[in-house]
A protein has these predicted regions:
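Cell-envelope/extracellular polymer assembly enzymes that use nucleotide-activated donors
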Residues: 117-120, 149, 305
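Long helical/loop segments within the catalytic core of UDP-sugar-dependent glycosyltransferases
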Residues: 168-205, 218-300, 305, 309-312
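Catalytic beta-strand/loop signature of glycosyltransferases that borders the donor
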Residues: 239, 314, 318-325
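A conserved acidic beta->alpha catalytic loop
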Residues: 146, 154-166, 183-186
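N-terminal membrane-anchoring/stem segments of glycan-assembly enzymes
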Residues: 1-113
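A conserved hydrophobic helix/loop-capping motif in glycosyltransferases and polysaccharide synthases
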Residues: 120-128, 143, 227
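Short, acidic, metal-binding catalytic loop of nucleotide-sugar glycosyltransferases
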Residues: 137-147
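The conserved acidic donor/metal-binding loop of glycosyltransferases
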Residues: 156, 210-215, 298, 310
């Protein structure tokens, strides 16, 4: 049955007022949104405001005991957290779908070969299948770039049958590839990266890092290194991608979750020079990497911590939402 709400006008007015406050918060950083994006945010704001007002109104009609009141307040605090997350997600969706023009450059740039700096590509590995790692190195050997080196470091792998085939493969690939097996070596992945940083050619101006199971596209360096033409640019980041997402439903769902981060969250962060650096498909200016004393070995998320240290020193970073490998 339809039940009359005697103070419906006041509730509606409160809903409108709350919606305006939410919209003011959402529109503070939405200058680049099209009308579709603003309309989407308005719908979200009014829906959330209506839900909140009705929930609180219905709650006040209940007979309250001290326990019920305490539980109700706790649930309201939890609901506030959920609402804040929903608002942040809505803003990210709006920017991903309805942004009229990006504030940051995201298209590949070109420079003539004589202006491209030398790049040192670092590949850390621990107890990795040699056949897989050799495929990674073969892909690096096919890079379309005039001046680069590849440093492979295997740290703490005990079985020589695992790392020696990779060492031999590096020798076959030529002088551009250098292999290091170090045991014992502390510092985990960061320790391995710092080791090869000390072995890097002094002429290298950019350090790039990939994982041992990643097959890069030939144009990776040629497309992204030119962004370092900006002297304030310290980090150039490409997304992670995966080549087994179509094998089954579970892997497809995992890949969809990753894509939400790399195609939405990282894009909106890039608009504000606030990307999260990750230690694969990343490039760092060598001078800046030395300035922050290399990769932080004390931190399990050495990649994100490195990015924060670089931002703290006033440098910029950019994210290119194009897959350059899997």
């Amino acid at each position: 049955p339809v039940v009359a709400v005697p103070n419906w006008f006041s509730l509606a007015a409160i809903s409108v007022g709350l919606s305006i406050l939410i919209l003011a918060l959402l529109f503070r950083d939405s200058a680049g949104l099209s009308s579709g994006g603003r309309g989407f945010l308005a719908f979200v704001a009014y829906a959330i405001a209506t839900f909140v007002v009705w929930l609180l109104y219905d709650f006040t009609l209940e007979y309250m005991t001290p326990v019920m009141l305490a539980v109700g307040v706790a649930l309201c605090v939890a609901a506030l957290g959920v609402i804040l997350v929903l608002l942040a997600e809505a803003h990210e969706w709006a920017e991903a779908l309805w942004l009229k023009q990006s504030r940051r450059p995201t298209l590949p740039r070109t420079l003539p070969d004589h202006l491209l700096p030398k790049v040192s590509v670092h590949v850390p590995a621990y107890n990795e299948p040699p056949e897989m790692l050799m495929q990674t190195l073969d892909a690096l050997a096919g890079l379309d770039y005039p001046d680069y080196e590849v440093l492979v470091i295997d740290n703490n792998t005990r079985d020589p049958a695992v790392w020696q085939p990779v060492q031999a493969h590096c020798e076959r690939l030529g002088a551009r590839f250098r292999f290091f097996h170090v045991a014992p070596l502390s510092g985990f992945k960061a320790g391995a990266l710092n080791y090869v940083l000390r072995e890097t050619d002094p002429a290298a101006e950019v350090v790039a890092v990939i994982d041992s199971d990643y097959l890069v596209e030939p144009n990776w360096l040629r497309d992204l290194v030119p962004f370092f033409d900006d002297p304030k640019m310290a980090v150039v980041q490409a997304p992670q991608d995966y080549r087994d997402g179509d094998e089954n439903l579970f892997k497809a769902m995992c890949q969809a979750e990753y894509r939400g981060f790399f195609r939405i969250g990282m894009v909106t962060r890039n608009e504000r020079n606030a990307i999260i650096q990750h230690g694969i498909m990343t490039m760092v200016r060598r001078r800046v990497l030395d300035e922050v004393d290399g990769w932080p070995e004390w931190c399990i998320t050495e990649d994100a911590e490195l990015g924060l240290s670089i931002f703290e020193r006033g440098y910029t970073a950019t994210y290119i939402p194009h897959s350059y490998g899997q």
